[in-house]
Swiss-Prot record:
Residue ranges, compositional bias (Basic residues): 60-71
Source species taxonomy: Bacteria, Bacillati, Bacillota, Clostridia, Thermoanaerobacterales
Name of the gene encoding the protein in the UniProt record: rplD
Pfam family, one: Ribosomal_L4
Domain of life: Bacteria
Protein name: Large ribosomal subunit protein uL4
């Protein structure tokens, strides 16, 4: 079992915690993590892009000039693709980019991402982090105490004040422990998690 230090919000070590091998100690599988990240990004795409074909562009119903005798190239419509303001050939149309990844693959990718954070000493476990009211300054102080600029902060579900306090800080994101994803774990330099959240992660993803 990997053992990591536990800190208070001031950055002082107050103990240690053993993390489950089945979640934080699995072999890091880079191809699987890559596939999970691609899947996450694809599922975020809106797919609302759209261009007009020659049949959808306004105008162009009349033949611009007669077929023969003008010396010019024959043309059937001023909305053909070769014309300025003409229709687009094979342009993007609205589509759904999302696709499903097998649950086992998604779970393995997430465990690999968590294990990579432990392996690379990029995990910070806090004894607790609770706020009575939204206070961005408190989160800024926390990051400063650990000399961190980029971090994913993971707390138990319901810690709304922590989420509200961190959302305006560039390079910082808050997630609830039962809503983790591989992309966000890998995106940020540090993975900051409370002891309570560790228990939830181990229970949900073990």
């Amino acid at each position: 079992m990997p053992k990591v230090a536990v800190y208070n919000v001031k950055g002082e070590q107050v103990g240690e915690i053993e993390l489950k091998d089945s979640v934080f100690g699995v072999p890091v599988n880079v191809p699987v993590m890559h596939e999970a990240v691609l899947n996450y990004l694809a599922n975020q795409r809106q797919g609302t892009h759209s261009t007009k074909t020659r049949g959808e562009v306004r105008g162009g119903g009349r033949k611009p000039w007669r077929q023969k005798g003008t010396g010019r190239a024959r043309q059937g419509s001023i909305r053909a693709p070769q014309w300025i303001k003409g229709g687009i050939v094979f342009g993007p149309k609205p589509r759904d980019y999302s696709y499903k990844l097998p649950k086992k693959v998604k779970r393995l990718a997430l465990k690999s991402a968590l294990s990579s954070k432990v392996r690379d000493n990029e995990i910070i476990v806090l004894d607790e982090f609770k706020l009575d009211q939204p206070k961005t300054k408190k989160v800024v102080e926390l990051l400063k105490n650990f000399n961190v600029d980029s971090a994913l902060i993971v707390v138990p579900e319901g810690e709304k004040n922590v989420e509200l306090s961190a959302r305006n800080i560039p390079g910082v994101k808050t997630l609830y422990a039962n809503y983790l994803n591989t992309y966000d774990i890998l995106k940020y330099d540090k993975f900051i998690i409370t002891k309570d959240a560790v228990g939830i992660v181990e229970e949900v993803y073990a």
